[in-house]
From Swiss-Prot:
Species assigned in the record: Clavibacter michiganensis subsp. michiganensis (strain NCPPB 382)
Superkingdom of origin: Bacteria
One GO cellular component term: extracellular region
Compartments, record wording: Cell membrane
TM spans (from-to): 16-36, 56-76, 108-128, 161-181, 205-225, 255-275, 281-301
Region entry Disordered, spans: 699-718, 884-936
Protein name (record): UPF0182 protein CMM_1204
Residue ranges with Low complexity bias: 919-933
Skewed-composition ranges (Polar residues): 699-714
Length: 983
């Protein structure tokens, strides 16, 4: 009775389970669809929908090709093996049991097995969409390799594709063969009887033909490997390209092996006809033996007994190929080398001819003054500046000035915890702040040429709102009717910034969320039901996301490697982020392969544990801008000779604008990118010599010195000194140019470590200011080579000299005030002036308080063996050169003062200021060392009142009042905390 009643219950649950499974599948499918549809909306709004559709189209097409190319052969192979099975096969008991298990599932398995392998193959094939599109749209480079005389585009665009196709086809044949063998064995077409293997005729034909196809593919693969020898590492990885043993043993050997593989394939076809396995077995054994003898032993013998006894002479021409290709592939072919016999004499007036350079020496370190920008220009906790600021230049009063710039962005962690605040109210940062790189105030603060809220200064009128930046929130919902309530907090205003001004976004910055369906899509994408439910969202609302400039450029130009340091500029009345993009390859024949992430790592940029970005070709092919207000991305084709860029222009037509579209103002802010320069300096450390013998023996290696100002933990390798932007006149230049430079020293060994300069590399980073035309010398590399017998101290040695100088040490002790302040050393700059090398290092002082910021108090200068430590750079230069350097620095008019607090930068500003040229907001007064308890209680009471007002405002739907109350609450809590810390 119990059993009978249970069966209907189980049957009744079956439809419910099926229904639940269908619903779950639909929900999952809709989540996936939401992600895809959100991508469509994002790309379409930005005007790059074609980029997304091209990627999807290529991926889907390759998936289908891969799926069918795998599934059909596997299915046909299994079907043929099954249909040609023996009718009355003699099976043992074990096979009988296998058949009994498999037979009920046979039909399903015959379709499922090919489908499963097809899915994996399709996914694998679709991942190669870039490789396929490069092959379909390949563009000749006009340069041929020295071994096979083939255009280098063959190696970059064609050879990887051919290898991928042959590898994929080989996988298809192997899986098909496994399917044939398994089916034939299961149904008795292949039987093991003692020591014999009996194969039916039909199975023999199928297996032999499949094996023949496989060996034919292996022959093609081996043949292609000839060409791969010129892009692979040779001589144990010493250099990239085919060496003597490769050219004279490996390449001919691979041609022979490819021919043998073709003969073996023919033997298998013959076996399919005549039914004898002797020929293919002998052929396969012969191929294995030949692979050992011709492919391995013979090249090893040539290397051991012919090359190694006379390696330098025999490998010379191949090292020469490597040198020429490497310098060409990394953009070093046209470098100008200038012998520089640096003097150490400090005679009066020595800098007179370099007066234009000394006037532009930057004393403001962008890696140090971030806290000063924050304390003087942040104004509110919900704003922030980055730790490492950027260097740019602006024309002020008819003169181009180096500046340190930063964008006042939102600080997402300080915008409150409510969803409304985080995504509707606090939506954007405000304005760009710029300070003269060559000046400081009398008390050591930056001299701002653009500052304050609202923004004012020398940069003129521009759109100050920053909706897109490096630290923007993950998403914001902006926009609305002009006549509607303004809920987006714009900037603090009123007396001491006590009030707030609100605004409504009026641009076209993101997809519209003007209907319920789109709101549902983005609610799923960001996993926030508030997007779907919030009644503050209207039919003109837009959702802006993916706001990081580098990320936006990377999405619309997926073929680019993006520079790690986008920088902001005011261009044509807008704040724009300028982003550099690189085209790279690791298939340039004979060019040395390098890990890019390792080459660009320094004290300001960390290196990943496992680099995965090998390159041996790089071009700065694209300059991009991202509008900070509406996020518009504009791509400019910068290197029009680059074959990789030309190829991608065929893939994504109309996405790149020509150089002629670059305005003169934008051109004046473009610069040579630091990551590209770091790659070039690392390669040049070995390839500054063109003599094959020197490369072979590693006799004249150079390296970049470690950053003398960086601190590293025990066991952590020292970080390299980053390159620095400066306006200076190098030997070979007729006037000062905005430049990027670095220095070289001999590499340290187990026995010695010489901290002396061997070279000085600079690149002209000034693109000019002519619309649509970059300066003729832009990107020109100049290498100053110092005599080997000179002992000009390198940055690390100069820093040691500074630290060990008695006078400097005594003054530093006074600045540290018994531990109440700390001394921060700025970037140690090196300049080729006065016939020698001048070192300049700003010295900052800051207190140990949480709200302190660094103040520029001293400048260290060294020339030869002499050291000066003065209040200003101008005074230090005169001190070094016996009272008269013959030139002036940017801080010549500064009269240093010593404030009562010691000039340590205590206190923070928290109110808006008008700013202006050369103006500096006055820091808010610091509280007394011992704040009364009633002050703390008053702050807590204010916080409680603000909290109640915020809750009441939310209840009434008044978002503006709620945001204002939330800000008062945050400030009151912060004030209470600071007061409690002082008790």
């Amino acid at each position: 009775m119990t059993s009978t009643s249970a069966r209907p219950a189980r049957r009744s649950r079956a439809p419910l389970a099926i229904t639940a499974a269908i619903i779950a599948a639909l929900v999952i499918a809709f989540f996936i669809f939401a992600g895809f549809y959100a991508d469509v909306l994002w790309y379409d709004q930005l005007g790059y929908l074609g980029v997304l559709l091209t990627q999807w189209g290529a991926g889907i097409a390759l998936f289908l090709v891969g799926f069918l190319a795998m599934a059909i052969p596997v299915f046909v192979s299994i079907q043929v093996a099954y249909r040609s099975r023996p009718v009355y096969a003699k099976l043992n008991s074990q096979l009988d049991r296998y058949q009994q298990v498999v037979e009920p599932l046979r039909r399903l398995a015959m379709f499922a097995i090919p489908a499963v392998f097809g899915l994996f193959a399709g996914v694998s094939a679709s991942s190669g969409w870039q490789r396929t599109l490069l092959w379909l749209n390949r563009t000749p480079s006009g340069t041929v390799d020295p071994q096979f005389q083939l255009d280098t585009s063959f190696y970059m665009f064609e050879l990887p594709f051919y290898h991928a196709v042959v590898g994929f086809a080989s996988a298809v044949v192997i899986i098909s063969m496994l399917g044939v063998l398994a089916t034939s064995y299961l149904y008795g077409a292949v039987r093991f009887t003692g020591r014999e293997v009996r194969i039916s005729k039909s199975s023999r034909i199928q297996i032999a033909i499949t094996a023949g196809v496989y060996f034919l593919l292996q022959g093609v693969s081996i043949w292609l490997d000839q060409y791969s020898s010129v892009v692979n590492n040779a001589n144990g990885g010493l250099f990239t390209g085919a060496a003597y043993s490769d050219v004279n043993a490996v390449i001919p050997g691979r041609a022979i092996l490819a021919g043998i593989a073709g003969v073996v394939a023919l033997f298998f076809i013959v076996t399919a006809v005549i039914g004898r396995w002797r020929l293919p077995i002998i052929g396969t054994a012969g191929l294995i033996v030949a692979s050992i003898l011709v492919g391995t032993a013979y090249p090893a013998i040539v290397q051991r007994f012919q090359v190694e006894p006379n390696e330098r002479a025999l490998e010379s021409q191949y090292y020469e190929r490597n040198i020429e290709a490497t310098r060409q592939a990394y953009g070093l072919a046209d470098i100008e080398e200038i012998p520089y016999d640096a003097t150490t004499d400090t005679t009066p007036g020595a800098l007179r001819e370099d007066a234009a350079t000394t006037a532009n020496i930057r004393i403001l370190d962008p890696a140090v003054v971030g806290d000063a920008f924050s304390q003087l220009q942040q104004f509110r906790q919900y704003y922030q500046f980055g730790d490492n600021l950027d260097v740019d230049r602006y024309q002020i009063d008819g003169r181009v000035q180096d500046t340190v710039v930063a964008v006042r962005e939102l600080s997402p962690t300080n915008t409150g915890t409510s969803w409304v605040n985080q995504h509707l109210v606090y939506t954007h940062g405000y304005s760009l702040v710029a300070a003269y790189g060559t000046q400081r105030t009398s008390d050591g603060q930056p001299v701002f040429l653009e500052s304050g809220i609202p923004a004012s200064g020398d940069l003129g009128d521009f759109e100050p709102r920053v909706y897109f930046g490096e630290n923007s929130p993950d998403y914001s919902i902006v926009g609305g009717p002009e006549s509607g309530d303004k809920v987006e907090l714009d900037y603090p205003s009123g007396v001491d910034g006590a009030d707030e001004t609100y605004t409504t976004f009026q641009g076209d910055g993101g997809p519209k969320v003007d209907n319920v369906f789109k709101r549902l899509i983005y609610a799923l994408k960001f996993q926030s039901e508030q997007i779907f439910l919030a009644n503050q969202i209207n039919d003109q609302s837009q959702i802006i996301y993916d706001r990081d400039p580098a990320e936006r450029v990377g999405k619309v130009a997926p073929y680019l490697t993006i520079d790690k340091d986008p920088y902001p500029s005011v261009v044509d009345g807008r704040v724009v982020w300028i982003v550099d993009g690189y085209t790279t390859s690791d298939q340039y024949p004979y060019s040395q392969r390098q890990d890019m992430s390792r080459l660009i790592a320094d004290s300001q940029q960390t290196q990943p544990l496992v680099p995965t970005d090998q390159i041996n070709y790089i071009r700065n092919s694209v300059k991009a801008t991202v509008d900070a207000y509406d996020g518009k991305v504009t791509l400019y084709a910068w290197d029009t000779d680059d074959p990789i860029l030309k190829t991608w222009q065929k893939v994504f037509p109309s996405t790149l604008k020509p150089i002629s579209d670059i305005s003169g103002e934008l051109m004046s802010h473009l610069r040579f990118p630091a990551d590209m320069f770091k790659v070039q300096r690392a390669v040049l450390g070995k390839y500054h010599v063109t003599d094959p013998g020197s490369i072979y023996s590693n006799q004249d290696l150079w390296t970049t010195p470690n950053d003398p100002t960086a601190t590293t933990e025990a066991g952590t390798p020292a970080s390299l000194q980053p390159p620095y932007y400066l306006t200076m006149q190098m030997p070979g230049q007729d006037a000062p140019r905005f430049s990027l430079y670095s220095t070289f020293i001999p590499p340290a060994t187990q026995d010695t470590s010489r901290s002396v300069l061997t070279g000085y590399l600079g690149v002209d980073s000034d693109a000019g200011s002519t619309a649509g035309e970059k300066a003729a010398d832009y990107g020109k590399l100049r290498l100053l080579t110092l005599p080997n017998d000179d002992t000009i101290p390198a940055p690390t040695q100069i820093q040691n000299n500074f630290n060990s100088d008695t006078n400097v040490a005594n003054q530093l002790n006074l600045l540290e005030r018994g531990g109440r302040t700390s001394v921060v050393r700025g970037n140690l700059l090196t300049l080729p002036v006065g016939g020698g090398l001048l070192y300049v290092q700003p010295v900052y002082v800051r207190s140990t308080g949480d709200t302190s910021y660094p103040l520029l108090r001293k400048v260290l200068v060294a020339f030869g063996d002499k050291i000066a430590f003065e209040d200003t750079l101008d005074a230090a230069l005169d001190s070094i050169f016996e009272g008269d350097s013959g030139a002036t620095a940017g801080d010549e008019d500064v009269v240093p003062t010593t404030p009562v607090d010691g000039g340590t930068g205590d206190g923070a500003t928290d109110g808006a200021t008008d700013g202006g040229t050369g103006s500096t907001p006055t820091p808010a007064p610091t509280t007394s060392p011992s704040a009364p308890a009633q002050d703390v209680q008053a702050a807590l009471d204010a916080a409680n009142t603000a909290l109640q007002e915020r809750q009441a405002a939310y209840a009434s739907g008044d978002l503006v009042a709620a945001a204002q109350a939330d800000q008062r609450f945050t400030e009151a809590v912060q004030r209470a905390y600071e007061l409690s810390q002082q008790q």
